[in-house]
C-alpha cells in the first residue's frame, strides 16, 4: 500500500466564465468543487491505476469535513483533524485565461504538528511507500518534512518527496534523505543559486553535487522533452512522444503516482520511469486535474524510450 501525505489540502473551486468582468457581478452557472492538493492528485491517480492507497494529512472545520467526504470511496482515508479551517482555492476560467485566488490556509499549532508525527508513525505500519507532496501550512517548521522522512526511514519505507523551496532545501541539508525527489530545472536552479539548462552533460554534473548526496533517485522533468534521471550512479534519458495537451496541471503529481507505484511493485528502472512518464502524460490529456484514462495507457507506454546515458 502507498501512503499519500497532503499537509496543506484545499477545496478546489472552479468558476467557468465566458468573460471575467471587473468591478461588477459575475454570475456562475456551473461550479465544480473537488478535494484538492498535490497529494490528493497523487491519491486519485493511484486509485485509478488500481493500486491500494491510504490518504492522510491535516484537515479542519466544515471545509475539512467536506474535503474528506469528497475523496473517492475506494480510497482509504485517515486524516488528522486540527482547529484551523481547511482552505479554499478558487480558479476562475475565463476564455483561454485562468485567474487563481489561493487562500493561505490554516495555521497549525505546535502541539498539532507533534501529534501528527505520532499519527503518521502509526500509519507507516500498514504501508510500503510514502508519497509526500506540496507545501507546508503555516505554523509548521521549515524542516518538518525532514521529520516525516526520518520516521519513514526508521520504519524502512521508501519515500517519494515532491516539494520545493525552503522545505526541500531543509530536507536536502538534513541527514534524513528520501528515496526519490522530483525537481524540475527551475527548482534545480533555485536550489543551486545558478541557472541550470537541459543539457544532459550539465545535468549529470548538477545531480552529482554534494547537496544531493544520499538520495537514491533524482528524477528531473524536462516537460515535452521527457525526463532525465539518476539512480545511484546510473543516468537515464526518457524520450516521450508528442501529445495533444489539454490541461498540464497535475501532471507532476501523476508522475509521482507512477514513481510510487514503481517502487511498490519493485519494478526495473526502465519500467518505473516509463510508468511515471505515461501517467504524467495521461493526466495532461484530460480536462480534470489528477485524472488519467487508463484505456490509453498501453498505447502510450509502448512509445516511450529509456536510454542509459
Curated annotation (Swiss-Prot):
Entry's Gene Ontology molecular function annotations: ATP binding; phosphofructokinase activity; tagatose-6-phosphate kinase activity
UniProt pathway: Carbohydrate metabolism; D-tagatose 6-phosphate degradation; D-glyceraldehyde 3-phosphate and glycerone phosphate from D-tagatose 6-phosphate: step 1/2
Enzyme Commission number: 2.7.1.144
SUPFAM superfamilies reported in the protein's UniProt record: Ribokinase-like
Record flagged with keyword Nucleotide-binding: yes
CDD domains xref list: FruK_PfkB_like
GO biological process, one term: lactose catabolic process via tagatose-6-phosphate
PROSITE patterns: PFKB_KINASES_1, PFKB_KINASES_2
Keywords: ATP-binding, Kinase, Lactose metabolism, Nucleotide-binding, Transferase
Pfam families in the record: PfkB
A single Gene Ontology CC term: cytosol
Taxonomy, superkingdom: Bacteria
Catalytic activity: D-tagatofuranose 6-phosphate + ATP = D-tagatofuranose 1,6-bisphosphate + ADP + H(+)
InterPro entries: Carboh/pur_kinase_PfkB_CS, LacC, PfkB_dom, Ribokinase-like, Tagatose/fructose_Pkinase
Protein family: Belongs to the carbohydrate kinase PfkB family. LacC subfamily.
Listed PANTHER family: 1-PHOSPHOFRUCTOKINASE, 1-PHOSPHOFRUCTOKINASE-RELATED
Protein name: Tagatose-6-phosphate kinase
Naturally occurring in which organism (per UniProt): Streptococcus pneumoniae serotype 4 (strain ATCC BAA-334 / TIGR4)
Gene behind this protein: lacC
Amino acid at each position: 500500500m502507498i501512503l499519500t501525505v497532503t499537509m496543506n489540502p484545499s477545496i478546489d473551486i472552479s468558476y467557468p466564465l465566458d468573460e471575467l468582468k471587473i468591478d461588477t457581478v459575475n454570475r456562475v452557472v456551473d461550479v465544480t468543487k473537488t478535494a484538492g492538493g498535490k497529494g490528493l492528485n497523487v491519491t486519485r491517480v493511484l486509485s485509478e491505476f488500481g493500486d491500494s492507497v491510504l490518504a492522510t494529512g491535516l484537515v479542519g472545520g466544515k471545509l475539512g469535513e467536506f474535503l474528506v467526504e469528497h475523496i473517492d470511496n475506494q480510497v482509504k482515508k485517515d486524516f488528522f483533524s486540527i482547529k484551523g479551517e481547511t482552505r479554499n482555492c478558487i480558479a476562475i476560467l475565463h476564455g483561454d485565461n485562468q485567474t487563481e485566488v489561493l487562500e493561505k490556509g490554516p495555521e497549525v499549532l505546535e502541539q498539532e504538528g507533534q501529534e501528527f508525527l505520532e499519527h503518521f508513525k502509526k500509519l507507516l505500519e500498514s504501508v510500503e511507500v510514502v508519497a509526500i507532496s506540496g507545501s507546508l501550512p503555516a505554523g509548521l517548521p521549515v524542516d518538518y518534512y525532514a521529520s516525516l522522512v526520518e520516521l519513514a526511514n526508521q520504519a524502512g519505507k521508501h519515500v517519494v518527496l515532491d516539494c520545493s523551496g525552503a522545505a526541500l532545501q531543509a530536507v536536502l541539508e538534513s541527514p534524513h534523505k528520501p528515496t526519490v525527489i522530483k525537481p524540475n530545472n527551475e527548482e534545480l536552479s533555485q536550489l543551486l543559486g545558478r541557472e541550470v539548462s537541459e543539457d544532459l552533460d550539465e545535468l549529470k554534473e548538477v545531480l552529482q553535487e554534494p547537496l544531493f548526496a544520499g538520495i537514491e533517485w533524482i528524477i528531473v522533468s524536462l516537460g515535452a522533452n521527457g525526463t532525465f534521471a539518476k539512480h545511484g550512479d546510473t543516468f537515464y534519458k526518457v524520450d516521450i512522444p508528442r501529445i495533444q495537451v489539454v490541461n498540464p496541471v497535475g501532471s507532476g503529481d501523476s508522475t509521482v503516482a507512477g514513481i510510487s507505484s514503481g517502487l511498490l511493485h519493485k519494478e526495473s528502472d526502465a519500467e518505473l520511469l516509463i510508468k511515471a512518464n505515461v501517467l504524467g502524460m495521461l493526466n495532461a490529456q484530460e480536462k480534470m486535474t489528477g485524472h488519467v484514462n487508463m484505456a490509453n495507457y498501453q498505447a502510450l507506454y509502448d512509445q516511450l524510450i529509456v536510454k542509459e546515458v
